[in-house]
């Protein structure tokens, strides 16, 4: 039974003296005399959030999008913070006579990872950390790696979009991509729980914003690159460069070893950038690891032959549909091999892997296939729909697009859906602060521009949209609800209401199956 550390922190931290921390990151005392000696207090934790402060913490007061963290310094100190780290703007906002040591750094975020790693005794050096990046497939690949590790008898930790796991147990957490202090604390807690290998998703945001600074990656994996996050990255080139921080020989974040899928141009460029990457391909590219003889396995699964760098053949199987998941599995196998787990050791775990909200089948006894998937960008939607499209069955897709995110992907998603599906139901995703109807219009513009003959319906209410697709489906058809996957809420404006595509689809199926059985 895994015991959960309070606040996902280790239960015991020896602590580091504040003067030593200041020296390590080049911080000085705030105030008129920048050469003043740094008080000799012991720091046992680091946090960005005043409400999370525990006695002995250093509170990092950073500039935010709308407010400066220094506004919350008084609360942090009241809760037991023994020191504050901030910039000049933060110092200017601190009020009253300061008795708590305040360290000044021109770019405090840039040193936060290094500082937190030092406080928690550099936990990634006590673990084998595998980092996986790419536009699509990160979550699935982390789950495949975790399953392979556990099948080989390793005590594994997982950090990703869906959540956190320690030795197979789900750990309640609101963290998705933890900030640097939370990540270092979590890695230290995992080390304390005798985890030996951690597999984690590494987003472009995490790399660009320093959230994984201070982490030593034993192996880095790259899945693919397609359009996404252009609300954050100004160009696709900038997006690529953020991912490349995990592989570039000149990057301080560079993983000790690299595994790269070269089935797209970005992967081939990334392999060249890394210089000594282990390559994988499910598309016939010349690579160290290859998949051949792909065949169906049961309902929705696949089996195939894996050829390793020595030319040895191994049989592998996954309970996940879609050829892109063969590529994800190859990346997982190569990563596992890099940390000493053979394909034979990993195989039983791979076959048992289920990933929440990723091509997740919902079965209520209906006579057609119903799935929920997280695909929320053009490339991912194309990959999923292509894997489901067959001439002997009809395909329906229910999807929308998130508000306050890259608007340039909306029309391409509409065009992709119209090209590959027989029924396209355009609905709301997470509109956030945007007009939901305006988002739907942008998607529908792409549908129109495609010139495809798919049946198209606009239903803003996501629950009603799902029910429409279920009512449309006949024996042997496929219904895909895409975009939200594992998410359990729908955000409109400032309000998030409970909403789970898996729950809604299951309920719609149960309602539909009853009358159909009665008619039969």
Swiss-Prot record:
Pathway: Cell wall biogenesis; peptidoglycan biosynthesis. The modification N6-carboxylysine is found at residue 243. It is found in: Cytoplasm. GO terms for molecular function: ATP binding; magnesium ion binding; UDP-N-acetylmuramoylalanyl-D-glutamate-2,6-diaminopimelate ligase activity. A motif (Meso-diaminopimelate recognition motif) lies at residues 429-432. UDP-N-acetyl-alpha-D-muramoyl-L-alanyl-D-glutamate binds at residues 48, 176-177, 203, 211. Belongs to the MurCDEF family. MurE subfamily. PANTHER family: MUR LIGASE FAMILY MEMBER, UDP-N-ACETYLMURAMOYL-L-ALANYL-D-GLUTAMATE--2,6-DIAMINOPIMELATE LIGASE MURE HOMOLOG, CHLOROPLASTIC. This is UDP-N-acetylmuramoyl-L-alanyl-D-glutamate--2,6-diaminopimelate ligase. The gene is murE.
């Amino acid at each position: 039974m895994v015991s959960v550390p309070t606040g996902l922190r280790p239960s015991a931290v020896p602590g580091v003296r504040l003067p030593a921390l200041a020296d390590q990151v080049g911080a000085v005392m705030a105030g008129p005399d920048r050469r003043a000696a740094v008080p000799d207090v012991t720091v046992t934790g680091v946090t960005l959030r005043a409400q999370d402060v525990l006695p002995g913490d250093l509170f990092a007061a950073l500039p935010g999008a709308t407010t400066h963290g220094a506004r919350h310094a008084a609360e942090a100190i009241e809760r037991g913070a023994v020191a504050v780290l901030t910039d000049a703007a933060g110092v200017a906002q601190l009020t009253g006579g300061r008795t708590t040591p305040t360290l000044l750094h021109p770019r405090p975020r840039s040193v936060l990872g290094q500082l937190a790693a030092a406080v928690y005794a550099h936990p990634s050096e006590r673990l084998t950390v595998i980092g996986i990046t790419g536009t699509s497939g990160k979550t699935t690949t982390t789950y495949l790696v975790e399953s392979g590790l556990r099948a080989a008898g390793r005590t594994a930790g997982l950090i990703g979009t869906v959540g956190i796991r320690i030795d197979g147990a789900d750990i309640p957490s609101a963290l998705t991509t933890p900030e640097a202090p939370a990540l270092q604390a979590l890695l230290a807690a995992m080390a304390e729980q005798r985890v030996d290998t951690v597999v984690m998703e590494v987003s472009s945001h995490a790399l660009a914003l320093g959230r994984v600074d201070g982490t030593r990656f034993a192996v880095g994996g790259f899945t693919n690159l397609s359009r996404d996050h252009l609300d954050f990255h100004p160009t696709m080139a900038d997006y690529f460069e953020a991912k490349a921080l995990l592989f570039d020989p000149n990057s301080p974040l560079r993983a000790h070893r690299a595994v790269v899928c070269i089935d797209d141009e970005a992967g081939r460029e990334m392999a060249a950038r890394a210089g000594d990457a282990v390559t994988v391909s499910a598309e016939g590219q010349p690579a160290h690891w290859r998949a051949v003889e792909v065949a169906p396995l049961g309902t929705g699964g696949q089996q195939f032959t894996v050829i390793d760098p020595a030319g040895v053949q191994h049989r592998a199987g996954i309970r996940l549909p879609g050829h892109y998941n063969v590529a994800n599995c190859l990346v997982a196998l190569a990563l596992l091999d890099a940390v000493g787990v053979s394909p034979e050791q990993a195989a039983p775990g791979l076959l048992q892997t289920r990933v929440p909200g990723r091509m997740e089948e919902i079965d209520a006894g209906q006579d057609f296939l119903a799935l929920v998937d997280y695909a929320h960008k053009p490339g991912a939607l194309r990959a999923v729909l292509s894997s489901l499209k067959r001439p002997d069955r009809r395909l329906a897709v229910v999807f929308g697009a998130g508000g306050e995110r890259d608007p340039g992907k909306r029309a391409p998603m509409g065009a992709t859906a119209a090209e590959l599906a027989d029924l396209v139901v355009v609905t709301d995703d997470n509109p956030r602060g945007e007009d939901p109807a305006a988002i739907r219009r942008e998607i529908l513009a792409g549908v129109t521009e495609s010139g495809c003959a798919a049946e198209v319906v606009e239903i803003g209410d996501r629950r009603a949209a799902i029910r429409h697709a279920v009512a449309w489906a006949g024996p042997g058809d496929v219904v895909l609800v895409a975009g939200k996957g594992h998410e359990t809420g729908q955000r409109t404006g400032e309000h998030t209401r409970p909403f789970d595509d898996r729950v809604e689809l299951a309920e719609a199926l149960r309602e539909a199956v009853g009358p159909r059985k009665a008619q039969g």
